[in-house]
Amino acid sequence: MEFGISMFGDNHYHSNGTVGSAGERLRELLTEVQLMDELGINFFGIGEHHRTDYAVSTPEIILAAAATRTKNIQLSSAVAVLSSADPVRLYQQYATIDQLSNGRTELTVGRGSFIESFPLYGYNLNDYEALFEEKLDLLVRINQQNPITWKGKYRAALNNQQILPRAVNDYLNIWVAVGGTPESVVRAARYALPVYFAIIGGNPVQFKPLFDYYHKAWAHYEHSAKQAQTGVHIHCFFGKNGTATANNYYPLYAAQMNRVGSTRGWPPYQRHQFDYGRGKNGALVIGDVNEAVEKILYLHEQLGFNRFAAHMDVGGPAHADLLQSIELFGNEVIPRVKKALGIATTN
């Protein structure tokens, strides 16, 4: 069981209507990941977006900077939008970070729940599924063989070409993030790739059939059962007082849900949704340490995942509040969850 933190680099929205600079948020991110490393948190993931509400469009640059400031923490995308990227270049970038970090780099890829990168990089949304399928196939092949000969529809063919540098130990750990479609789960199992379930709404237990489906598909493709790995990605935020934390964080969280929702036709986000999400059957882990421990243990009992990714900067909370949330997660939440599960801890 591993515990980590993911972020998107949400920009700070100030009460006077101004937005904090990207540079400010990027520098904060590096301080935050340093703290995670010092606390012994297992992994850090940073996402890719091309919108005004997020500071990070190139996760690999943030991870390269983080590699020079950290010693032990695993560094990953969360996620890299593979459909609008070149798998060759993506592998090279993350293999470079892997070399820089002495083997601490992972690559998590997804189709992308935001579509801004498709027109930005010249891809047709009508090819959404086909792009991801072809590019995942190429990425996996690059990770497994060098040199490589390959031909597809959406990029130039490769003819006995070397892809360099190679990752440490000539292998990059690649995860696939899915939003909940059976097809995505089967695809990950077919390629023998570990999978993250992005659970950002509803009742998380509803994902249990997909967990089971993944393991069933994994067995169907005759992979070793011991190698199957699953993770969950869940919105989290921690404070010393549960009620105060919820009350203070709700306006920021709701504002970001509404910024995203305004582009997707969602109705305005309401407090009752937030409160339901914080409850036993909801998909938010927001509150004090006791609430967090209880919720994570319940989710683990129901879903049986190997990794828990606490997504922690939705809405751009203040840097000081994020540092406190990270400290509570690393110093109190993780050790207590591990103890309850009988997992040895060095924290």
What residue ranges belong to the model's regions?
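N-terminal beta1-alpha1-beta2 module of alpha/beta enzyme domains
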Residues: 1-70, 74
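Conserved, mostly hydrophobic/aromatic
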Residues: 3, 48, 66, 97, ...
